[in-house]
Amino acid sequence: MSQMENSTKKVESVANVEVVTTENAKVEQKPTSPADAIQLKVNANSTIKNLKTLVSIVKLTESGAHIGLNPKKWNPKMASYIHAKRSNNHVIDILKTILFLDRAYKFLQEVSQNGGTVMFVGTRGRVVKELIKAEAERTNSFYVTQRWLGGTLTNFTNISRSLKKFNSNLALLESEEINKYSKKEQIAINKETAKLEKFYGGIKNMKQRPDVLILVDPVNDVNAIKEARKLNIPVIALANTNADPQLIDYIIPVNNYSVKSITLILGVLADSIAELHGEPTKIVGRPDSEIVLPETKSNWKQNNYDPSKRGYNPKYVNHKSTFNKFNNKKPVDSTTNEIKTNVIKAETK
């Protein structure tokens, strides 16, 4: 066997992701896409190849699951989960994403088989909160999308009192007993219930502590992890390059700043519970054509600013006609305005 056949070759991808693979064949396989480049390494890795395909590599790369944060923000403890450094970002080893996702998937199925309960936690971003709520409701799990209240797990006795008060108010508002209260008292009860709904709406039916926590951002919600570790509650977390893997029991190295990648990973984890109960899955076992990722829009669009809103500054608008568009006026030349003002001044004199 020649030295050329045993040499390690580098495969360059379109998305600036470099994948190293060892080829023993004489014919060199050239990838045509980032997913194909990664697939070459998957075929050479028996550990990855024998795993159940939860989500395709094409969808993972399409969602940007491999894109890490700026190296300035990284945690050195995540070095073993980082494949390379490209431009201003680290590149997450997507093969380890697949490997650890399968590990978390199987663990969740074991918990569900034993009748365990799951709590989804994510308090960053409106879209992520809505996604967490949807997946939790789909699997009859608990969820926390507002600020993590200290003692949610460690001081469950006090939390149980608040939950009891919340459920009592809900039952009161739905019954005819509420009519016995004065209007002022009804308003006070509604305000109290709305406040409790904000923080306890996702755990109102929780009778005991959950058996597993699933976190979207272990850095932002580190207090939830600290409480879980005190009680030996396993934690599954989507970890970017700034996370501390030593705090996480079942880590999934992935881009948790992308709504698309969060949608994929949370969908797979929720499918592990849904599949066990005979419910239809959203990601697992479905072709890529049936998996719809959310469309993301840029946060900064100058032409979408409304001049009637507070803080509007015309100097940040690219074209002068943009301002007139919101006022339903046609653009008027500045020289015409000067002529009109001069005529008005002459008439007043």
Swiss-Prot record:
InterPro entries: Ribosomal_uS2 (IPR001865), Ribosomal_uS2_bac/mit/plastid (IPR005706), Ribosomal_uS2_CS (IPR018130), Ribosomal_uS2_flav_dom_sf (IPR023591). One of its GO terms (cellular component) is cytosolic small ribosomal subunit. Residues 302-334 are annotated as: Disordered. HAMAP family: Ribosomal_uS2_B. Belongs to the universal ribosomal protein uS2 family. NCBIfam families: rpsB_bact. This is Small ribosomal subunit protein uS2. It comes from Ureaplasma parvum serovar 3 (strain ATCC 700970). The lineage of its organism: Bacteria, Bacillati, Mycoplasmatota, Mycoplasmoidales, Mycoplasmoidaceae.
